A protein has these predicted regions:
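Interfacial segments of alpha-helical transmembrane regions
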Residues: 6-22, 86-95
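Transmembrane alpha-helix/helix-exit interface in multi-pass inner-membrane proteins
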Residues: 21-42
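Perimembrane loop-to-helix junctions flanking transmembrane segments
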Residues: 40-55
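A loop-to-helix transmembrane entry motif
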Residues: 51-71
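Juxtamembrane helix-break-helix junctions at the cytosolic face
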Residues: 72-89
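Membrane-helix boundary connector in multi-pass membrane proteins
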Residues: 85-89, 93-96, 103-121
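Alpha-helical transmembrane segments of multi-pass integral membrane proteins
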Residues: 107-146
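Intrinsic disorder/low-complexity segments
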Residues: 143-157
Length: 157
């Protein structure tokens, strides 16, 4: 029997749901602080160091569309993560990895620019929830492997 956490969800599902909520809060911060305008400055600085990275502009509409789509995908896939659908678990792992990198990126940006950058206030939340989801995915994978009987040499051949 799986341990249940708040709302009667198992730990992975609850943490993945929190990841979606953290991303929603993060997107709100980024929108209100106009990350889409700062994007030109940040990618320009990166382009100076790594010319292969293009300096990029983003309209507020494009930014909102991308963020709302990402949040909808995260929260919409919660029932499938709960059902342990392989595609949803893969998505959960990719999303968690993206959020860990997102949290690191905003924090690094604040250090690099020596001050506030859009998104840095909520960056720790997306980072931590990303780590928690990855941890649960690894733990679940270990439990599945531990419960799966190993095949004898004869059965493998």
């Amino acid at each position: 029997m799986m341990d249940k956490s708040a709302l009667g969800l198992d730990h992975l599902t609850f943490r993945f749901w929190l990841l979606g909520l953290a991303q929603a809060a993060h997107s709100i911060e980024e929108t209100f602080t106009r990350l889409y305008d700062f994007f030109w400055v940040a990618t320009g600085r990166l382009h100076e160091i790594v010319p292969a990275i293009a300096q990029t502009r983003m309209t507020p509409r494009t930014f909102a569309l991308l963020n709302m789509s990402f949040i909808a995908i995260l929260l919409g896939s919660v029932p499938f993560v709960r059902a342990r659908k392989p595609l949803a678990l893969g998505l959960a792992g990719i999303a968690a990895g993206i959020e860990v990198l997102n949290g690191i990126g905003h924090t690094a940006g604040a250090i690099w620019f020596r001050g506030y950058v859009p998104g840095v206030a909520t960056a720790p939340f997306v980072f931590v929830t990303g780590v928690l989801v990855l941890r649960e995915l690894i733990r679940d994978a270990g439990e599945v492997n531990a419960l799966t009987p190993s095949l004898s040499r004869k059965e493998r051949e």
